[in-house]
Amino acid sequence: MSLAAEQATFDAPAYLTWEAEQPAKHEYLDGEVFAMAGASAAHVTIALNMAMALRNHLRGSPCSVFISDMKLQVAADNAFFYPDVFVTCAPSDKAQDQYKSSATLVVEVLSPTTS
């Protein structure tokens, strides 16, 4: 049985520790943990094309582009999400390897199940 099934809620540090050991990705919202579903080929292609276009546009700037394997902390909502694509230009995010917390832009690709 997983820790998520045994434990009703997590605090953020416990979630980050637990999530780092999981084979699948989970998002976190105010103590609750949610397993992430896979994406279609079209969804992944659209997200990748957007990430590549942003990366090319931002080349030479202090900004970095991340895809769906990097967590984004939304402190105001006590949450960690895996956006399809996001951009951060914050120097503080360069030092943080497990997640980023200062997104300048967030891109979510909508699908029939998420729109």
Regions found by a protein language model. Name each.
Residues M1-S115:
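Gly/Pro/Ser/Thr-rich low-complexity, intrinsically disordered segments predominantly at protein N-termini
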